[in-house]
């Protein structure tokens, strides 16, 4: 009976993991906020495109696309990316809520991968833009 319970638990665990959707980014594609803030402060962003895929462009120098869970904003992102070289470093962020709940970062990052961008990054804001950027006094758009 004990073995049957263990096997049932393993099967349930495997099934639930298979049902969970994988994030479209790798850990190596997460950019630390301190690194981006340093690059902005030291004016080392000439080769970098920073894109907000959430409700507001807060990070200094970022382009406001709008929430990409909305199809029209995802299409706006697609159009914005048309003239950007595929090897250009692109950092996207949202920050509306914790990563696990964010409706915007997954479709936007998946689009970057679909379009073949080789140097795409996701700004690592695991909690939200306030906690992980604003409260640290990192550079913002005026």
Kindly give the residue locations of the regions a language model identified.
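Rhodanese-like catalytic fold shared by cysteine-dependent sulfurtransferases
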Residues: 4, 16-30, 57-142
